[in-house]
Amino acid sequence: MYDVKSRVATEFIDDKEILDTIAYAKQNKSNRELIEQLINRAKDCKGLTHREAAVLLECDQADLNQQMFHLAKQIKQKLYGNRIVMFAPLYLSNYCVNGCTYCPYHYKNKTICRKKLTQEEIRREVIALQDMGHKRLALEAGEDPVNNPLEYILESIETIYSIQHKNGAIRRVNVNIAATTVENYKKLKDAGIGTYILFQETYHKENYEKLHPTGPKHNYAYHTEAMDRAMEAGIDDVGIGVLFGLNMYRYDFVGLLMHAEHLEAAMGVGPHTISVPRIRPADDIDAQEFKDAISDEIFEKIVAVLRIAVPYTGMIISTRESQKTRERVLNLGVSQLSGGSRTSVGGYAEEEPEEENSAQFDLNDTRTLDQIVNWLLDGGFIPSFCTACYREGRTGDRFMQLVKSGQIANCCQPNALMTLKEYLEDYASDDTRRKGERAILEELKHIGSDKVRQITINRLELMKEGKRDFRF
């Protein structure tokens, strides 16, 4: 029985409700009156239910689909402006005890080079990341209680925050590790993490168990209920996602929205971020073996309808996707982007030899961070390295209230410009610096408050003298 407020996985992600929703959406895929009503109602940026969003995803009317794409861009612009938050993943270890059939970290894989970074190696990686210009990291590690115990993750977080090389600093560490206990989530909270990220992979219980045949991750309920435990432990910001291509995309799309609705109903606040990765080739993984892979067209529509349905959330796309695809979805609602990424264990301080391949998946976008910043500026976006909300306590419900009211721009816009200025002063190529300076001058005109604009201008001048780390 479907119950959005239940803390039981199979009740807030109810199979019958998902199947009924998909059937309802298919019945109404040509219902212009209903679809137009939903599009018009979504313009107030209050979102849509999973059932309503499923109808938009299924819509077979070309002109209405174009209206959806336009609306998704409008909503993102209204709530998050033209800012794109930059981050990089840092893989600490690929030791793993799970048997996930789509991931090369699975314990049966004897061809992958197993690695685990020491604290000194982490130090070198962080210096390399700081020297690129990054301020925000997403930590990744396989699930292995012997090689990657929580104590190792906590020590690594402490090491990362302690390093300040030249003008560099990692100011927000997000963590993507396996589902764990309330007690362990409290320890992560105390370590000062930003967002706790955990992908569901697929919400289809039977397929989930087949894809995860062995190891602790096999437990569907424990995995699916992880965000409840994390939020119970005091972690304000959580990030959810599915790996599109593992299962029927309609099913996982609906499940993803039901999960977001559950978190808001049961825990008081929805997901801080939603990620939309697609399965990619990797060491001993052939992506073509997965028959539910989705086309670029479907992928783009998923991104657009997610933005319409969950307008408040940050939407993340990684270097799994090509430059062309990333460019398309940036105009459909994506608000966070990785750049200059390595998916191997380490790989920033020194390029990994080909024979030591330890990567979780192959990259599709191999450009440097500077090339991506330059490209974003060309597209009219403002690359943002801001971490101020986390550091100022604007997390959880406080953050969501600011986003939903449209007031987040009062902080985000000047903070984005100041962190971009830091990047331009310390790390950018000459061409990127010229483009960035022009963009900052133009964007200053759009700061609504005269007082905030003048403070921002004054701080930008101080940055020319070497001052750093200003924020609203």
Give the location of each predicted region.
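Canonical Radical SAM [4Fe-4S] cluster-binding loop centered on the CxxxCxxC motif
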Residues: 80-81, 85-121
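An N-cap/entry alpha-helix motif that binds or orients negatively charged groups
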Residues: 36, 40, 44-84
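Generic structural signal for well-ordered alpha-helices
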Residues: 88, 126, 154-161, 185, ...
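Core AdoMet radical
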Residues: 107-124, 128-230, 237-246, 268-275, ...
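Radical SAM enzyme core and accessory elements
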Residues: 1-37, 41, 327-335, 341-472
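Conserved C-terminal portion of the radical SAM core fold
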Residues: 141, 195, 200, 221-285, ...
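Short glycine-enriched, charge-decorated loop/helix-capping segments at active-site entrances
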Residues: 211-217, 288-292, 358
